[in-house]
Regions:
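Bacterial signal peptide processing site
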Residues: 23-26
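Conserved C-terminal helix/tail region of periplasmic/extracytoplasmic solute-binding proteins
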Residues: 365-400
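A bilobed periplasmic-binding-protein/Venus flytrap-type ligand-binding module shared by bacterial periplasmic
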Residues: 167-174, 210-212, 297-309, 328-332
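Early extracytoplasmic/lumenal segment of secretory-pathway proteins
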Residues: 36-120
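C-terminal motif of bacterial Sec signal peptides marking the signal peptidase cleavage site
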Residues: 18-21
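Periplasmic-binding protein-like
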Residues: 138-139, 236-242, 281-305
């Protein structure tokens, strides 16, 4: 499982031209087999050995709950008892932080979003995963396996954790008629100037690209994460125009709930869990997956190529997607579970229906975050696409 930085790893990084991170890719129904750049040559673990006694994780808040935040929310303690692996969790706030932490070699596994995954693969910081050592993998929805954000040339680099779509949420008393298009937030002459909200991340450029993909076909956009310079410039220009109408860029979903509750925001990008929270607080909001489709996220548990506790890491990956635990974390975090059997074990029996867990037709219109790279992931070989580092620079310019 250990490896050194080789010239091949450097070559892979150079080919990708990657920098910071947050990501995107195609729908669950596309690109089986994943991305096709050449990563460092690493071997997946072949067999499981004895527990090393502990595992060091990097995770999003809510993914490795041990009862310390809420005594009723704890799936770590039983894991420790059953496996003998003490869980040490470092909660990360951004994909960039996750990538930086993984590079230290001090952690065994990470719950990486698509915008971080390819960077970890290209740098040699993440190793291939032997899915045969993860028995619960067989019950993961097929639409989450072997995708651009979690595999390369048919080689799996992680275990799917869950998924969610970026929805269009609106105040039903302030926004009329009910919107069914992203034009509600991208129309330069919007009636809701100063009340539009947008997700605060460079990956949001993909949302603009998706809108242009559907409304300006002459640009030739086939994948919102594969933009040549002309396509990228068009998306950036659209977002610069939108900036005049944006009252707030959000990254903390509780702050977005507050903004809709106060009336500071009336329409914008949101998540299902935000909608549920706002409605529970009696905020008059609804959300829709617009006719153009949407971007979305699917997190993946990846193992470090320098893992000091790989057996415990594999045990953790199998545990976190086991039906009961996957149901618990999906409800607590607010997402669709990755394990199909989890749907019968949720406390809210409508959870999987609400989050479209088994509705693959729904996910066909969701373009999951995947790291934009110089090698166009839409299959073009006669041009270069704009890599994520340039997205980061452009995002600063967009926000002014």
């Amino acid at each position: 499982m250990r490896l050194n930085r080789t010239s091949r790893a450097a070559a892979a990084l150079g080919a990708l031209l990657l920098a910071t991170a947050c990501s995107s890719s195609n729908t669950a129904a596309t690109s089986p087999g994943g991305s096709d750049f050449t990563p460092p040559k690493l071997a997946a673990q072949k067999t499981l050995g004895k527990s090393e006694g502990q595992v060091n994780l990097i995770a999003w808040a809510g993914y490795a709950e041990d009862g310390s935040n809420d005594p009723k929310v704890d799936w770590v303690t039983d894991f420790e008892k059953q496996t003998g692996c003490q869980v040490n969790t470092k909660t990360a706030g951004t994909s960039d932080e996750m990538v930086s932490l993984m590079k230290t070699g001090q952690y065994d596994a990470v719950s990486a979003s698509g915008d971080a995954a390819l960077r970890l693969i290209a740098s040699g910081d993440a190793a291939p995963v032997n899915t045969e050592l993860v028995p619960n993998y067989k019950d993961v929805f097929s639409g989450l396996k072997d995708q651009q954000w979690n595999s390369v040339k048919g080689v799996s680099y992680g275990i799917p954790h869950g998924r969610g779509a970026n929805l269009l949420m609106y105040n039903t008393k302030k926004v009329s008629p009910a919107p069914d298009s992203w034009s509600a937030v991208f129309d330069k002459s919007s009636s809701y100037k100063g009340k539009v909200t947008a997700y605060d991340s460079p990956i949001y450029i993909a949302d603009a690209a998706l809108y242009l993909m559907k409304t300006e076909p002459s640009l030739g956009i086939k994948d919102p994460y594969a933009l040549d310079q002309k396509q990228f410039d068009a998306a950036v220009d659209l977002l610069k125009d939108q900036n005049a109408n944006v009252g707030e860029y959000w990254s903390d979903y509780l702050k977005e709930v507050s903004a809709f509750k106060s009336g500071d925001s009336v329409v914008g990008t949101s998540w299902q869990v935000i909608l549920n929270t706002a409605q529970a607080e009696k905020v008059p909001v609804k959300a829709v997956l617009p006719k153009e489709g949407a971007t979305g996220w699917s997190d993946t548990w990846m193992i470090s190529a320098k893992a000091k506790h790989p057996n415990c890491a594999y045990n953790w990956m199998n545990w976190i997607i086991s039906p009961k635990v996957n149901a618990q974390v999906a409800e607590y975090f607010g997402e669709a579970p990755s394990n199909a059997k989890a749907c019968t074990l949720t406390t809210d029996k409508n959870h999987c229906t609400t989050y479209h867990a088994a509705d693959e037709s729904y996910w066909k219109d969701v373009h999951f975050w995947t790291t934009p790279i110089a090698q166009c992931v839409d299959g073009r070989t006669d041009t270069k696409c704009v890599p994520y580092a340039k997205w980061v620079q452009a995002w600063t310019e967009i926000k002014g």
